[in-house]
Each structure stands twice: as structure tokens, then as C-alpha cells.
Amino acid sequence: MRKNIVVGNWKMNKTLQEGVFLAKELELALKERKVNCDVIICVPFTHLVAIFETINTKIVKLGAQNNADRVSGAYTGEVSAAMIASIGVQYVILGHSERRAYYGETNIILKEKVKMALENNLIPIFCIGEVLKERVAGKQNIVVRKQIEESLFDFSAEDFRKIILAYEPVWAIGTGRTATPVQVQEMHIFIRQILIDNYGQAIANETSILYGGSCNAGNAKELFINPDVDGGLIGGASLKVDTFLSIIEAF
């Protein structure tokens, strides 16, 4: 049975001190509640060690926001999957639309990043999704299929079952546009069918597919009620405990 998961992606926000305080505040709030999902926060690299040493990672699981596509070496500014894993971190976001758009990460580069993550026992939260031009042209299914096939389908079934997927329609992030629950469910069904075609029904059914397009306290419940939406990848709304809790409690 697949898990319900809510992931907070802090992006490039919060100083170290602010981040440690926020993580601890979230942990304390969750201790007082019975929630029906796993809660993960993916924080800046600079915060990982301090937060790992501060919180109970059985209550709030911890992830990074990226890892390098190389093992080690002369790659100034990069952080390897092995370095992240050595902290004790369990998860890493890969393929986020901002990494694709601003840093030129291609499907082939991302395949290498996923490979590095899996080899170091990190669980990839792998992002896929189309931009507005592709949605308007009706090409969203083609784009998403290509992202999945080129980045992920060289992995064995045993490796693939460790991966979490997150659909983020780029056109619905910070644009004032929103994907309807029907549009979201349609895409999640399509994604699951791609997995069925390649890995079979069992693995498709156990793969968590999250939604990452401006999911907030106001729309989380109507999104999460869809049978193929297994949670959310949350950006700005994860930076305030009360707001983030409202999304977590939408399950």
C-alpha cells in the first residue's frame, strides 16, 4: 500500500537559525497530533546537519533539495549524494522545475543524479511537469512521458520502487493560474498508467505520486481526495508551521 506524503520544499529560504527554529516548531506541533501522512522537509544544504541533530527524524523526515551527478572530484560548488547520505538524511528532491529552467538540468543529467542518489540509499523525490506553452498546445502528456522515460526507465523495478514522483505543472506555480482537481487527477492517472506499462500494476500501485503546483491550505483537501493524488510537494506554504499543518491535516 502506497504512502501519503507531504513534503515541504524550503527552497532558498531561512537562515540557519531560522531554519532550526522552524523545524523544531514543526516537530513539536506534530508530536501533539496524529497525522495520516509522512512529513518530510527538504532544506538548504547549510541547514542539514544542524536540523538533523535537532529534530526527531521519525516525526519529521529530512531531505536535501539536490545532489550532484558525479561521485566526487573537482566540481566546485557541488554536493554529492554520498555527502548528503553521510549526514543521515533520507530524501532528496531531483528534477524540480526551477533546476530544469534555471540551471539547465536535462533528463539525461537527472538520470545520473537519480543513479547517484539510489547508490547512496537516498530516496529521490523526482519532479515532472509541463510549462504553460506545452499545456496550451496539448502536449503535456508527451512531455511528462518523455521526462519519466528518459530519466527513470533505465532503472530496475527494484530501484524504481524506491522513487517518489511529484507532478508539478509549471504553469500553475506562482502564476495565478491553478490546476483543477480534475486536471490533476487526470495527469496522475496518466502517470500511473505509464508506470503500469513499464513496471507492472504492483509497482505502479505502490508508487506515491505527489502534486506540486501551488498546493495550499485552501485547496489541499480537494486535491488529496483524488484517489491517485498521494500528497503534496509544498513550497512557500511550508515556511509557516500553521499553514503547513493545515495541508498535512488535509488527509
Curated annotation (Swiss-Prot):
Q: Which UniProt keywords apply?
A: Cytoplasm, Gluconeogenesis, Glycolysis, Isomerase
Pathway where it operates: Carbohydrate biosynthesis; gluconeogenesis; Carbohydrate degradation; glycolysis; D-glyceraldehyde 3-phosphate from glycerone phosphate: step 1/1
Q: What is its EC number?
A: 5.3.1.1
What reaction gets catalysed by this protein? D-glyceraldehyde 3-phosphate = dihydroxyacetone phosphate
Catalytic site positions: H96, E168
The biological processes this protein is annotated with in GO are: gluconeogenesis; glyceraldehyde-3-phosphate biosynthetic process; glycerol catabolic process; glycolytic process
Q: Extract the InterPro entries matched here.
A: Aldolase_TIM, TIM_sf, TrioseP_Isoase_bac/euk, Triosephosphate_isomerase, Triosephosphate_isomerase_AS
Q: Name one GO molecular function term.
A: triose-phosphate isomerase activity
- Class of this enzyme: isomerase
List of residues binding substrate: N9, W10, K11, G174, S214, G235, G236
A GO cellular component annotation in the UniProt record: cytosol
List localization entries: Cytoplasm
- Subunit structure comment from the entry: Homodimer.
Give the similarity note: Belongs to the triosephosphate isomerase family.
Role: Involved in the gluconeogenesis. Catalyzes stereospecifically the conversion of dihydroxyacetone phosphate (DHAP) to D-glyceraldehyde-3-phosphate (G3P).
Q: What is this protein called?
A: Triosephosphate isomerase
Q: State the species of origin.
A: Azobacteroides pseudotrichonymphae genomovar. CFP2
The lineage is: Bacteria, Pseudomonadati, Bacteroidota, Bacteroidia, Bacteroidales
Q: Which gene underlies this protein?
A: tpiA
